[in-house]
Curated annotation (Swiss-Prot):
Residues 173-203 are annotated as: Disordered. It comes from Rattus norvegicus (Rat). The gene is Rab13. Belongs to the small GTPase superfamily. Rab family. The small GTPases Rab are key regulators of intracellular membrane trafficking, from the formation of transport vesicles to their fusion with membranes. Rabs cycle between an inactive GDP-bound form and an active GTP-bound form that is able to recruit to membranes different sets of downstream effectors directly responsible for vesicle formation, movement, tethering and fusion. RAB13 is involved in endocytic recycling and regulates the transport to the plasma membrane of transmembrane proteins like the tight junction protein OCLN/occludin. It catalyses: GTP + H2O = GDP + phosphate + H(+). GO terms for molecular function: GTP binding; GTPase activity; protein kinase A catalytic subunit binding. It is a lipid-anchor. PROSITE patterns: RAB. Highest levels found in lung, kidney, whole brain and spinal cord. Expressed in all tissues tested including Sertoli and germ cells (at protein level). Also detected in osteoclasts. This is Ras-related protein Rab-13.
Length: 203
């Protein structure tokens, strides 16, 4: 019996507690939003199969607790991850400053060459913004990674961010041997077309 997918990619979301990691995963995997999620205890994951470049990609997206006391639990899960999304909250400057610590944690624990993506969540809360887009763009350039601003609440750029990371992993693993590594268009990921006027950025 043929497999229901061509590739299985394990993705990991890391970042401070309260930045919206669980909400992002629920939005991506189930297209749902609930603002009352309690802080994740331990680790959980969701699965969604998407189509990118004509390949069926099964994404196993792992949620991690941001609290330091869970660091030993999260460390074990870095190793098998093919892609890591570093999440901060645009209304919380400290969560952005701590991205450098999370970068260090990736370097110490993850596989060499793991794909990374920087994600500024809660961009629907523009009035409370503490982290300017330019700051994050600068950090992303510094580390040579992609950057998106998302809103799990309004669904802005959530599919696009996961699609971008999955596509980069696919290219790296030889899923497509083309020289075209430009950023993904909205057609790369077969999802429902969500119309919105939110001005969150993607990079």
């Amino acid at each position: 019996m043929a497999k229901a997918y061509d590739h299985l990619f394990k993705l990991l979301l890391i970042g401070d507690s309260g930045v919206g990691k669980t909400c992002l995963i629920i939005r991506f995997a189930e297209d749902n939003f609930n603002s009352t999620y309690i802080s994740t205890i331990g680790i959980d994951f969701k699965i969604r199969t998407v189509e990118i470049e004509g390949k069926r990609i099964k994404l196993q997206v792992w949620d991690t607790a941001g609290q330091e006391r869970f660091k030993t639990i999260t460390t074990a899960y870095y190793r098998g991850a093919m892609g890591i999304i570093l999440v901060y909250d645009i209304t919380d400057e400290k969560s952005f400053e701590n991205i450098q610590n999370w970068m260090k944690s990736i370097k110490e624990n993850a596989s060499a060459g793991v794909e990374r993506l920087l994600l500024g969540n809660k961009c629907d809360m523009e009035a409370k913004r503490k982290v300017q887009r330019e700051q994050a763009e600068r950090l992303a350039r510094e580390h040579r990674i992609r950057f998106f601003e998302t809103s799990a609440k309004s669904s802005v750029n959530v599919d696009e961010a996961f699609s971008s990371l999955a596509r980069d992993i696919l290219l790296k693993t030889g899923g497509r041997r083309s020289g075209n590594s430009s950023k993904p268009s909205s057609t790369d990921l077969k999802v429902s077309d969500k119309k919105n006027s939110n001005k969150c950025s993607l990079g």
